């Protein structure tokens, strides 16, 4: 095995070396394109190279100063320069090497016949400018509506933006990061009429002190506003009312002011129309930023069951919600910036559902639960951020706090036993981040500090109102977590490449108190020393890291629980650009983390019937992963293709045993090595035909996992598979008619080795939307959403939602809108799904037919 591994590593090194050496067959040429008569530089000139057969090899576009850069491959025959209003100019490669400056002559005939159209995309070196007017149609209202159409850019349901499959460095408005990682406030609130361009700066190094010294493979998004919207207040206020099962309201307000030194974005939303607003308080976390990423733990006591459904959340959420955000940024001196981001949201949700649990195995158990509850929560989350970004000094100081409360009061009918259940949670989080970078000649010094304190008090009360009560509980938990993660690193230039030496110290002090019993605390200290080497070449880079870790832990309640261990967590990342269109990424690594919940000495009830026993030590999760991605983006033809494959193999030293009977559910840890694996494959294709205004996107996802578990003392191994395909189309060529369609097909199946059984379920979702403009200011819209869900093999449940809308633009600033949703008055959602050897049948009521009338005012 070791010999095979050596051969694999040797082959990989030889392949990379050959690839790097092979770059010598290509060269670059720089020059300036000017007007032959006036000598003025020409911008946006199309510069392309071809082989002898006329096949396009590379392309570029001249910048505002007429400068261009072209890569000349070995089989390049000639280059061609074209611009509207000018005669095309073809030049051989040999001539281009002798004189790289190019002049274009005006074409008098072309000037008479030319029709001025907005170019969808302009390229200036590593900056790609998407002109919004070329992608926007009359139905787009907010920035997010157009972002989803831009080639290479993806926006998920939570508003997180990725570019070519990678998270972005920063989301800026006119060069400033007003919102930090809460930028979905801008994507969902910024009026699209105010936006001129979306700039994507590829390979952007946002830290000035590291530019030209440390490579960045991520992009920065910058929103450019129209000149009429700069340095003045603008925004939108809409208010609406209507009726369904109760009186309805919806208020949405946005105020924006973007000036050179100051930026302001204020939002206010409130509704009872099903729009849950809690996403605005969440940050989009980059999990590749290990030093600055620490997930917030979930509540241990909860009565919630099914929170995600594959239909629009507005269909089943009976809410009263409010959200307010105040974001301000101010430049301090030449290189400083101070911003404050304050978000508040509150929710009240009336919920009811029914769940049939069929726990399989050697002793099957049937549990039928019906729940009616009122869930309330609120969160206040301010952030104060100072940044100094000078050529030799970079500093970030960020203070984040969060205060929240959640309550859930309900009545549960469990196998015909009535139970009053209440949960209550109060949490506080205080977090501080410090980042500093200094350049001392050729040497770079970096310091990072992350400190977070988290405290959560939880209560669970259940009152069994039957004749023979067994579910009377009064559970109280107090969780506290303190984590401090500090690191110092220095960067040297070794053999023309970057060598980073990094030392990190992580300290954790976590504790849990159950009832008024002992406060169970555990501590751990991890020291890490990591040499990291980056080999850069003209087409990409290879990154290798070999961290050595020393972990020491101790359980306070166990006198001889001290544990020390040393381990390596190597990683490899290879990014390669075959040309300006093709890009690949390969990564592999080993992680060795703590697994499971915090250890504690006793047990608690997480709900009225589930008993959770604690771990008496820290669990360990050893994971090996391999990931590969390939991306093709052609900004001339507006075509992009992505493919990603990720595989992981995990080994844990414990896993949970689940026990179900008619009265209780129990979760007990078992100290035994267990292995699992997962495979994820994803591919997507996007194509925009700008002349006919047709946008298409197709995706295919496949997820496979193998997971062993123990249920009712019997060990099982289940193989789960999910295949999902989707196709989106939009056609907006005609000014009076637009057509949209989104279709999704899901297939899930599971194989159980113990029972030699296999289960499969299918689902299909399709949304068709039609917008008609009989006159310029009048718009009619209708949408039909059809859902076909297989609840059991060969048994299907179908839902069809039909919505209609009408809007009339009174003036440039005022618009009236009327909407009717769920015209067929669908009242119940039904779903069946498998989890391991268990089957669940779920029902939930839906919002009925509703009408809403609103008025919107732009200012």
Predicted regions and their residues:
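Short Pro-Gly-centered beta-turn/loop motif in secreted/extracellular proteins
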Residues: 42-43, 69-77
């Amino acid at each position: 095995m070791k010999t095979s591994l050596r051969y694999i590593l040797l082959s990989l090194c030889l392949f990379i070396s050959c690839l790097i050496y092979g770059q010598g067959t290509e060269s670059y040429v720089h020059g300036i394109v000017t007007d032959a008569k006036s000598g003025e530089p020409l911008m946006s000139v199309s510069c392309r190279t071809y082989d002898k057969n006329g096949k396009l090899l590379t392309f570029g576009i001249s910048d505002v100063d007429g400068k261009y850069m072209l890569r000349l491959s070995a089989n390049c025959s000639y280059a061609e320069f074209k611009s509207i209003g000018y005669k095309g100019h073809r030049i051989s490669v040999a001539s281009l090497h002798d004189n790289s400056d190019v002049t274009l002559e005006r074409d008098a005939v072309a000037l008479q016949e030319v029709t001025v159209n907005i170019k969808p995309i302009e390229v200036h070196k590593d900056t790609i400018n998407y002109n919004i007017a070329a992608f926007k149609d009359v139905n787009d209202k907010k920035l997010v509506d157009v972002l989803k159409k831009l080639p290479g850019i993806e926006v998920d349901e939570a508003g997180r933006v990725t570019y070519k499959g990678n998270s972005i460095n920063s989301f800026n408005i006119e060069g400033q990061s007003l919102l930090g990682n809460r930028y979905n406030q801008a994507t969902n609130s910024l009026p699209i009429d105010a936006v001129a361009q979306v700039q994507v700066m590829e390979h952007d190094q946002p830290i000035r002190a590291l530019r030209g010294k440390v490579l960045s493979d991520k992009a920065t998004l910058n929103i450019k506003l129209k000149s009429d919207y700069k340095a003045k207040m603008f925004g939108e206020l809409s208010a609406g009312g209507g009726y369904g099962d109760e009186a309805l309201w919806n208020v949405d307000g946005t105020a924006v002011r973007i000036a050179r030194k100051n930026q302001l974005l204020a939002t206010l939303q409130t509704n009872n129309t099903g729009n849950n607003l809690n996403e605005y308080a969440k940050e989009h976390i980059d999990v590749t930023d290990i030093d600055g990423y620490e997930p917030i733990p979930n509540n241990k006591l909860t009565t919630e069951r099914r929170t995600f459904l594959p239909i629009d959340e507005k269909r089943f959420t009976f809410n009263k919600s409010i959200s307010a955000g105040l974001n301000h940024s101010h430049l301090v001196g030449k290189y400083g910036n101070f911003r404050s981001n304050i978000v508040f949201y509150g929710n009240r949700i009336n919920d009811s559902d029914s769940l049939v649990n069929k726990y399989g195995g050697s002793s099957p158990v049937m549990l039928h639960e019906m729940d009616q509850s009122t869930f309330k929560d609120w969160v206040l989350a301010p952030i104060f951020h100072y940044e100094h970004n000078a050529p030799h000094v970079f500093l970030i100081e960020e203070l984040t706090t969060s205060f929240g409360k959640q309550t859930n009061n309900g009545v549960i009918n469990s196998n015909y036993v009535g139970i009053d259940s209440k949960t209550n949670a109060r949490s506080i989080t205080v977090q501080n981040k410090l980042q500093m970078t200094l350049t001392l000649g050729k040497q770079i010094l970096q310091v990072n500090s992350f400190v977070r304190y988290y405290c959560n008090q939880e209560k669970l009360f259940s009152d069994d109102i039957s004749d023979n009560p067994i579910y009377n509980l009064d559970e109280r938990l107090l969780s506290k977590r303190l984590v401090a993660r500090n690191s110092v690193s220095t960067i040297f230039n070794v053999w023309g490449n970057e060598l980073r030496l990094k030392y990190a110290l992580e300290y954790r002090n976590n504790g849990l108190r159950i009832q008024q019993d002992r406060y169970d605390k555990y501590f751990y200290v991890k020291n890490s020393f990591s040499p990291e080497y980056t080999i850069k070449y003209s087409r990409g880079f290879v990154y290798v890291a070999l961290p050595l870790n020393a972990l020491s832990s101790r359980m306070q309640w166990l006198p001889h629980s001290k544990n020390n261990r040393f381990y390596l967590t190597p990683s490899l990342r290879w990014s390669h650009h075959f040309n300006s269109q093709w890009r690949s990424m390969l990564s592999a690594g080993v992680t060795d983390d703590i697994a499971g919940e915090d250890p504690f000495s006793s047990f608690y009830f997480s709900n009225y019937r589930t008993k959770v026993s604690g771990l008496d030590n820290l669990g360990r999760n050893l994971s090996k992963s391999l990931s590969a991605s390939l991306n093709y983006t052609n900004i001339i033809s507006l075509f992009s293709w992505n493919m990603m494959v990720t595989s992981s193999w995990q080994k844990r030293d414990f896993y949970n045993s689940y026990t179900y009977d008619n009265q209780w559910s129990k979760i007990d840890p078992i100290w035994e090595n267990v292995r699992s694996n997962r495979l994820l494959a994803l591919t997507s294709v996007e194509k925009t035909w700008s002349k006919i205004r047709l946008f298409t996107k197709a995706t295919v996802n496949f997820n496979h996992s193998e997971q062993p578990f123990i249920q009712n003392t019997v060990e099982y191994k289940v193989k789960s598979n999910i295949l999902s395909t989707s196709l989106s189309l939009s056609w907006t060529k005609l000014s009076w008619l637009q057509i949209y369609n989104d279709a999704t097909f899901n297939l899930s199946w599971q194989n159980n080795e113990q029972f030699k059984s296999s289960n499969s379920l299918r689902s299909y979702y399709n949304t068709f939307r039609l917008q008609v403009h009989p006159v310029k200011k009048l718009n009619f819209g209708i949408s039909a959403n059809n859902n076909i869900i297989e609840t059991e093999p060969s048994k299907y449940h179908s839902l069809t939602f039909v919505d209609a809308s009408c809007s009339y633009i009174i003036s440039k600033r005022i618009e009236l809108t009327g909407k009717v949703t769920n015209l067929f008055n669908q009242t119940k959602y039904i779903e069946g799904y498998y989890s391991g050897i268990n089957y669940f049948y779920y029902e939930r009521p839906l919002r009925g037919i509703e009408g809403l009338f609103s008025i919107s005012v732009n200012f």
